[in-house]
């Protein structure tokens, strides 16, 4: 019987039994993106290896949309700013994801923006129309909207 541990919130069976040829198969699962160190121990001997888990792009969602700067002049050049954060279903940041952006009331935004390594992206909004503009960030079937004022 071999004892098994794993770091970074990864899950393993606490013990596994050797096959007739002396090998074991260790199944490691995780909902946390990143590197997990898996250690197998028997008697006073142990070996460790790193395994890597990546965020699940299939479950990309807009986890957060926050207004960073509001109340800019309606001059078509001075921007209000929002920050969107994209994660998978387990809250792992997703880099390199394309977020669709819309704004109403005549406001102008880039139609798509791409997330940074931490899963965030800044959205700049300009307008020549004074008033409230709803800004919507979307990915897959997930979207959030926030109002900004010019």
Where are these regions (language model features)?
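The feature marks long extracellular or luminal low-complexity segments
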Residues: 1-150
């Amino acid at each position: 019987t071999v004892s098994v541990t794993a770091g970074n919130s990864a899950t393993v069976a606490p013990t596994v039994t050797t096959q007739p040829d002396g090998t074991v198969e260790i199944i490691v699962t995780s909902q946390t993106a990143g590197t997990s160190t898996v250690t197998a121990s028997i008697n006073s001997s142990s070996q460790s290896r790193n395994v890597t888990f990546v965020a699940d792009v299939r479950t990309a969602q807009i986890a957060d949309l926050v207004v960073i700067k509001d109340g800019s002049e309606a001059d078509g050049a001075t921007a209000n700013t929002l920050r969107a954060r994209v994660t998978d279903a387990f809250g792992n940041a997703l880099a390199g994801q394309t977020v669709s952006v819309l704004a109403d009331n005549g406001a102008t935004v880039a139609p798509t923006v791409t997330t940074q390594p931490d899963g965030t992206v800044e959205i700049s909004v300009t307008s020549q129309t004074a008033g409230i503009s709803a800004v919507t960030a979307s990915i897959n079937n997930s979207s959030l909207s926030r109002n900004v004022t010019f």
